[in-house]
From Swiss-Prot:
GO terms for cellular component: cell surface; extracellular region; phosphopyruvate hydratase complex. The keyword Magnesium applies. It comes from Brucella anthropi (strain ATCC 49188 / DSM 6882 / CCUG 24695 / JCM 21032 / LMG 3331 / NBRC 15819 / NCTC 12168 / Alc 37) (Ochrobactrum anthropi). One of its GO terms (molecular function) is phosphopyruvate hydratase activity. Binds a second Mg(2+) ion via substrate during catalysis. This is Enolase.
Length: 425
């Protein structure tokens, strides 16, 4: 009854207007699953590879080759398989690709099928996706990391850090957390406008004002939190995504906006000072993806009092994560389904992190769609934290809205992670 009888891949557009892969999977009993694949702007060198067409069509970014793989090789390989055999299906596709980075048939092709299979199987069993994937104990609603000021590769402004985030740790529910975020977001918009700044939004829905440095961005956010009636650090904490690989050049961190250069130790000390001066509880990619010594220095410096998240460092890859665990580097992993390219490997990365005492943060990409799968996966894994952008743009709010629905559906079983999501609070 849960045998796969049809798979249809198609080319659709993501939130940046670039092509991406969408996949429909149909089972023998008529159950149906659909998944759309996200895409990043600042991508780690060690990520699984999206298959793009090249040439002039869509300026080289077309995904017809990946769609062809879905409708051809992948369908031929997994047609008739039981959709509930997720691991076997994912392994079959990985072996079909045959490369270390999924570059032959494309991580975007494999992931689209992997997620659509899980959704179809969930429908066949009569369970919501978070319950199907996570089992009976899936009940923790994640604290959102809301990206309200954008810089770096996500915006055209002088700020070198990529994201400045708020975390509503003091809220009592995800519904309240979304309200906290929305009120701060709109307060920030007014304050930026009153100060003469542009209030257009970046790729992830946050504002992209021309501010001179990170401190200026953090000051605006702190003022907006207070003006909205909340207490910084108590109701709402702060987070950074430095995306440091983007400005790591010849062994140093080159801040073009500030016209400063910091060596790895100076970079770590700068981040430590920011975390001391502001209620910053999480820093993502504070060091570059291959600056293992810098990461170790940063972890030794503030790893006992701040969440240090590896994104480009770990790329949702259990093998790289195990290297980091062994070296005592970072204390958290960012989880992006398209970095590794299959649901099974994504779940394995979360499990590896939790076993080692590392936290895990479920995450979107800057190029998103209306697909809200990551909201379900955040609850399924009880990871307690989610990064899915700002409080604007429907490609971002779709995930918040899904979390609100899940919380409502869980009723009294639902538990908002709140301050418990971060061991340092």
């Amino acid at each position: 009854m849960t045998a796969i009888i049809d798979i249809v891949g198609r080319e659709i557009l993501d939130s940046r207007g670039n092509p991406t892969v969408e996949v429909d999977v149909v089972l023998e009993d008529g159950s149906f699953g659909r998944a759309a694949v996200p895409s990043g702007a600042s991508t780690g060198a060690h990520e699984a590879v999206e298959l793009r067409d090249g040439g002039s069509r869509y300026l080289g970014k077309g995904v017809e080759k990946a769609v062809e793989a879905v409708n051809g090789k992948i369908f031929d390989a997994i047609a008739g398989m039981d959709a509930e055999s997720q691991l076997l299906i994912d392994q079959t596709m990985i072996e079909l690709d045959g490369s270390a980075n999924k570059g032959n048939i494309g991580a975007n092709a494999i992931l689209g099928v992997s997620l659509a299979v899980a959704k179809a199987a969930a429908q066949a069993t009569g369970l919501p996706l978070y319950r199907y994937v996570g089992g009976a104990n899936a009940h923790v609603l994640p604290v959102p990391m809301m990206n309200i000021i954008n810089g770096g590769a996500h915006a055209d402004n002088p700020i070198d850090f990529q994201e400045f985030m708020i975390l509503p740790v003091g809220a009592s529910s995800v519904r309240e957390a979304v309200r906290y975020g929305s009120e701060v977001f709109h307060t920030l918009k007014k304050r930026l406008k009153d100060a003469g700044h542009n209030t257009n939004v970046g790729d992830e829905g946050g504002f992209a004002p021309n501010l001179k440095n990170a401190q200026a961005a953090l000051d605006f956010i702190m003022e907006s939190i207070e003006k909205a009636g909340f207490k910084p650090g108590e109701d709402i904490a702060l987070g950074l995504d430095c995306a440091a690989t983007e400005f790591f050049k010849d062994g140093n961190y080159v801040y073009e906006g500030e016209r400063k250069t910091r060596d790895p130790k100076a970079q770590a000390k700068y981040l430590a000072k920011l975390a001391s001066d502001y209620p910053i509880v999480t820093i993502e990619d504070g060091m570059a993806e291959d600056d293992w010594e810098g990461w170790k220095y940063l972890t030794d410096l503030i790893g006992d009092k701040c969440q240090l998240v590896g994104d480009d460092l770990f790329v949702t890859n259990s093998a790289r994560l195990r290297d980091g665990i062994r070296m005592g580097v970072a204390n958290s992993i960012l989880v992006k389904v398209n970095q590794i390219g299959s649901l099974s490997e994504t779940l394995d990365a979360v499990e590896t992190a939790h076993k080692a005492g590392y936290t895990a943060v479920m995450s979107h990409r800057s190029g998103e769609t209306e697909d809200s799968t990551i909201a379900d996966l955040a609850v399924a894994t009880n990871c307690g934290q989610i990064k899915t952008g700002s409080l604007a743009r429907s490609d971002r709010t779709a995930k918040y809205n899904q979390l609100i629905r899940i919380e409502e559906e869980l009723g009294k079983q639902a538990r908002y992670a709140g301050r418990n999501a971060l061991k340092f609070l």
